Amino acid sequence: MQFTSVFTILAIAMTAAAAPAEVVPRATTIGPNTCSIDDYKPYCCQSMSGPAGSPGLLNLIPVDLSASLGCVVGVIGSQCGASVKCCKDDVTNTGNSFLIINAANCVA
């Protein structure tokens, strides 16, 4: 085989290997047995980070964002692209279906 043939085959193989693949988001289905602890409900949560004592809702209620989760209620059968947390039902509702939950009241 000639050098150009080997080079061409390698170039085509490397191009095919470098082609981007379809990105599929990781999602968890929330089921009826997601939370096996009584009085705990499933929430789809993303952790929030920030300095302790950061201003909270409307800058009136101080919220420690380092110990809070931003969550939405997990509806059975829905998909959660973040992480599903089982939390006690004492949450702060921001009025737009986004909830602030104390992370100490949640289990993984």
UniProtKB/Swiss-Prot annotation:
Keywords associated with the record: Cell wall biogenesis/degradation, Conidiation, Disulfide bond, Secreted, Signal, Sporulation
Effect of residue 100 to G: Impairs self-assembly and rodlet formation
Compartmental location: Secreted; Spore wall
Gene: eas
Effect the entry attributes to changing residue 101 to G: Impairs self-assembly and rodlet formation
Result of altering residue 98 to G: Impairs self-assembly and rodlet formation
Free-text domain note: the Cys3-Cys4 loop (residies Cys-45 to Cys-71) does not have an integral role in the formation or structure of the rodlets and that the major determinant of the unique properties of these proteins is the amphipathic core structure.
Phenotypic consequence of residue 75 to G: Increases self-assembly and rodlet formation
Protein name, per record: Class I hydrophobin eas
Function field: Aerial growth, conidiation, and dispersal of filamentous fungi in the environment rely upon a capability of their secreting small amphipathic proteins called hydrophobins (HPBs) with low sequence identity. Class I can self-assemble into an outermost layer of rodlet bundles on aerial cell surfaces, conferring cellular hydrophobicity that supports fungal growth, development and dispersal; whereas class II form highly ordered films at water-air interfaces through intermolecular interactions but contribute nothing to the rodlet structure.
